[in-house]
């Protein structure tokens, strides 16, 4: 297995494009992913009870298990838009299906942007009419789905599976309202692997728990969170079967794609200057370790301390104590590989030296609870003045 350069359309049988539909002032805002043959589709969605119209539609598509295309607009979330919003999402499906001679129920729709605003359907229709099946425009898709993001987020891997080279590509957006429990977070993954839809869904659901569900920027879960994975079988590999060595390799590749995308989202949190990676080990079990890791990385006090390069490890210990349901009297804690706590007792360290290390753009926090073999990670970012500025003026 190796990481390669590519786009969301690098796996065989996929195409992608994007246009400026004038939903934004000047940037690309309407993107398409198209499989040239029917593809198995898996998905995981927001747990927010107020979910967007596209989420309702896509849940049904994933339930049926097959799709040909994904269309995604930015700038307008099409959430809390009532019956008209749902009708607009269905209309978007229909327009794209007619354009590329597909069935409407084969088209997944996604939206991201401001909540409570209706889609401008004339602009959507005009934009769809401009989408094409050109092979040279796939890289544009990653730009079209952005909102407050400062950069595109992509990843590509390939591996030999079932006697063939299998490609997997991922693209995502997300910068604010990131606290998935599955933020706004959208992620799209394509692969030319041959694998049954039920196994595809099972695998994605498992991997989501240790990747996308372990990132947080601001503690808010979006109405639109969506992860979609399409597998069209065009690599012509022997079908991947659960429990086989091919399956383990496929699952590892999907985990790498999802973790890379999740970390890219965390690093690009609104106003962020640093990626924070928290590793908790020695917990009673993995689930507890992941829960504690996410609590630490989501703490506003921890996030602001990291922004200020302040080695205030007490805030980390406080976060652990708030959620631990077991005895925590033997904690070992490291910041940037510097030991600050051993057997729950403070260790002398050079605060000025550690403060300098906390100015780096990736911060690593490792907590060993010495209470079991559970291991978990979570990712987030620092909390800055810029975050407040961005969100105070978001709809202005």
Swiss-Prot record:
- Keyword field: Acyltransferase, Amino-acid biosynthesis, Arginine biosynthesis, Autocatalytic cleavage, Cytoplasm, Multifunctional enzyme, Transferase
State the pathway, as annotated in the record.
Amino-acid biosynthesis; L-arginine biosynthesis; L-ornithine and N-acetyl-L-glutamate from L-glutamate and N(2)-acetyl-L-ornithine (cyclic): step 1/1; Amino-acid biosynthesis; L-arginine biosynthesis; N(2)-acetyl-L-ornithine from L-glutamate: step 1/4
Q: Which one Pfam family would you cite for this protein?
A: ArgJ
* Residues flagged as site, Cleavage: 183-184
Question: Which molecular-function annotation in GO is an example for this chain?
Answer: L-glutamate N-acetyltransferase activity
Q: Could you tell me which InterPro entries the record lists for this protein?
A: Arg_biosynth_ArgJ, ArgJ-like_dom_sf, ArgJ_beta_C
Q: Which reaction is recorded as catalysed by this protein? A: N(2)-acetyl-L-ornithine + L-glutamate = N-acetyl-L-glutamate + L-ornithine; L-glutamate + acetyl-CoA = N-acetyl-L-glutamate + CoA + H(+)
Supply the SUPFAM superfamilies for this chain: DmpA/ArgJ-like (SSF56266)
EC numbers: 2.3.1.35, 2.3.1.1
Cellular component, GO annotation: cytoplasm
GO BP term, pick one: L-arginine biosynthetic process
Keyword Cell inner membrane set for record? no
Identify which top EC class this enzyme belongs to: transferase
The UniProt annotation places substrate binding at: 147, 173, 184, 270, 391, 396
Compartments (UniProt record) = Cytoplasm
Member of which family?
A: Belongs to the ArgJ family.
Q: Function of this protein?
A: Catalyzes two activities which are involved in the cyclic version of arginine biosynthesis: the synthesis of N-acetylglutamate from glutamate and acetyl-CoA as the acetyl donor, and of ornithine by transacetylation between N(2)-acetylornithine and glutamate.
Under what name is this protein listed? Arginine biosynthesis bifunctional protein ArgJ
> What is the species of this protein?
Lactococcus lactis subsp. lactis (strain IL1403) (Streptococcus lactis)
């Amino acid at each position: 297995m190796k990481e390669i350069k590519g786009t969301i359309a690098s796996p065989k049988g996929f195409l992608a494009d994007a246009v400026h539909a004038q939903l934004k002032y000047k940037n690309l805002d309407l993107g398409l992913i198209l499989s040239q043959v029917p593809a198995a589709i898996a998905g995981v969605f927001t747990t927010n009870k107020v979910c967007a119209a596209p989420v309702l539609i896509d849940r049904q598509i994933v339930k049926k298990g097959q799709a040909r295309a994904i269309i995604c607009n930015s700038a307008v979330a099409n959430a809390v838009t009532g019956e008209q919003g749902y009708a607009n999402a269905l209309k978007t499906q229909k327009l794209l299906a007619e354009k590329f001679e597909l069935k409407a129920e084969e088209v997944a729709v996604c939206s991201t942007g401001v909540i409570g605003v209706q889609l401008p359907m004339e602009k959507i229709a005009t934009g769809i009419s401009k989408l094409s099946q050109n092979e040279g425009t796939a890289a544009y898709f990653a730009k079209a789905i952005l909102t407050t993001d400062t950069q595109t987020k992509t990843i590509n891997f390939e591996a030999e599976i079932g006697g063939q080279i299998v490609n997997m590509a991922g693209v995502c957006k997300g910068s604010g309202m990131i606290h998935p429990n599955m933020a706004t977070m959208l992620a799209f993954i394509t692969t030319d692997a041959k694998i049954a839809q039920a196994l595809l869904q099972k695998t994605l659901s498992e991997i989501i728990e240790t990747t996308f569900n372990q990132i947080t920027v601001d503690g808010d879960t979006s109405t639109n969170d969506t992860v979609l994975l399409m597998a069209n079988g065009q690599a012509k590999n022997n079908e991947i079967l659960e429990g086989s060595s091919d399956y383990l390799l496929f699952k590892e590749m999907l985990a790498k794609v999802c973790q890379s995308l999740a970390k890219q989202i965390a690093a690009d949190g609104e106003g962020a200057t640093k990626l924070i990676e928290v590793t908790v080990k020695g917990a009673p079990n993995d689930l507890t370790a992941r829960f504690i890791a996410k609590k630490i990385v989501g703490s506003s006090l921890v996030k602001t301390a990291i922004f200020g390069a302040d080695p205030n490890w007490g805030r980390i210990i406080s976060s652990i104590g708030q959620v631990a349901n077991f005895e925590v009297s033997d904690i070992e804690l490291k910041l940037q590989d510097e030991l600050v706590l051993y057997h729950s007792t403070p260790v002398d360290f050079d605060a000025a030296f550690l403060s300098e290390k906390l100015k780096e753009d990736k911060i690593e926090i490792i907590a060993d609870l010495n209470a079991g073999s559970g291991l978990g990670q979570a990712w987030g970012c620092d909390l800055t003045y810029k975050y407040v500025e961005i969100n105070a003026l978001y709809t202005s």
